[in-house]
Structure formats: structure tokens, C-alpha cells
Amino acid sequence: KGTFYIVTTNMYSQIDRNKPNKTKSNTNFIITAKNPAGPWSEPHVIEGAGGIDPDLFFDDNGKVYFVGTHNPGDMYSNGIGAIWAQELDLENWKLVGDRHSIWEGACDKRHTEGPHIYKEHGKYYLLVAEGGTSFHHAVMMAASDDIFGPYETGLRNPILTSRHLSKKNWVHSTGHADLVKLKDGRWFMVSLGKRNDRDGHSNMGRETHLMPVVWESQIVRWQQISKTKWEPVSYLFPVVAP
């Protein structure tokens, strides 16, 4: 408490003359400050933390977790991505314990990235971006009783997207979201999105959008309670408010 953290990726490309394509590499690091206006610390590089768009989760038991992405294949060729989590030692800025691959996404399971974990209603909620950052951009969410899973997805995923709308819709490519809870109990979502002009151009690129959300019950699975009877298992999930 009393410390601000920024965790981000330093990503770069370099040309290998022996290969026709660019070689991509990255480093994830954390900086801290007592005031968001600064001064900020020197970067603490987290060795072994690959992937992009990481986040930190501070659990109520005092443990801190680094949440990032990894690629079962080549993310830049086949789009497959997954989310991993591992405990982080903030005293020494090192990953400790085992690494767990916790989710691959909900719908098309491509370019799963930008993870955020929240603990609400007695469960861990994992929010991710999926589908790339263009017209198939979307926000997915899953829930679990344990931070390392297994995570179960609501049947109403994606909880935010514009992929089903015309490319002429005035806001499109919505995704890469985060949730914020106000002191009065209200919830809001911030996400990326593009605004089109009359000719369909997005001159401002990706902008940040703000919208209210509410938590509603969603079925995650059906469980058999007798030979002839099944009942739904439901969790609360955030949805964009009207």
C-alpha cells in the first residue's frame, strides 16, 4: 500500500540478415513511485517473464502475482496465445514457484492477451483481450475458485465487442479493457476503440473509451444432480450497462 506500480513491455524488432523476417524480442519490467507524478524508480527487469501486456495482481493474502502471455506456437504467424500466472517476489523482483498456464480464451482463442485478474464475489476473475486489435477485437472473461484455475467462461462472452457490427459503425475495434470499482460501489470499464469519420477513416487511431458495467448472473455449465435432473451453475459476470 502507498506504492504505485507500472508494469509494461519494452518490445523491439531487429533484422537478422540470415532470415527473411524480423526477429521480435521483448523485456517486461516494473517501475514504482510513491506519487503518480513521480519521481519513478529505475526499471526492475523481471527475468524469465516473456510475452506482452503483463499485469500485477495483489491478492488479499499478501501474495503478488505476475500475469502475462505466452505462445504455444508462434503468436505472430498463427495468432495462438495463452495466459500464464506466477507468484512474484517484490523484495527481489523475481518470479518464484511454478508457472501456470491458466487460460487460452473463450471464443476464437486467437491473440489472447492483455490479462487482468480481479477478486470479487468470492472468485477470481480473469479479463483478457482476444481476436487481435482490429475489427475482431473483443473482451472475454472467465472465473475460478483458484487463481491458477481452472477458469470457467460465461456463456455470454464476449462481454464487449463490435465484431458483429458493420465496419461503418461509428465505434469499432473495441477491446483491451480494464475494470475500475469506485468507492460508491459502481463499476466502470475502460477499453480501446476506434472512431470512424464519414469516409470510414480512424484518424485518431485507438482511443480510450469509458462505459458503466453491472454484474449479472451467467450460466457457466450444467451439472447433473440425479439420473434425470440437471441444474445450471451460474457465476456473476460484468456486462456493459444500458
Q: What is the predicted role of each segment?
A:
Residues 1-242:
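Carbohydrate-active catalytic/glycan-binding domains of CAZyme proteins
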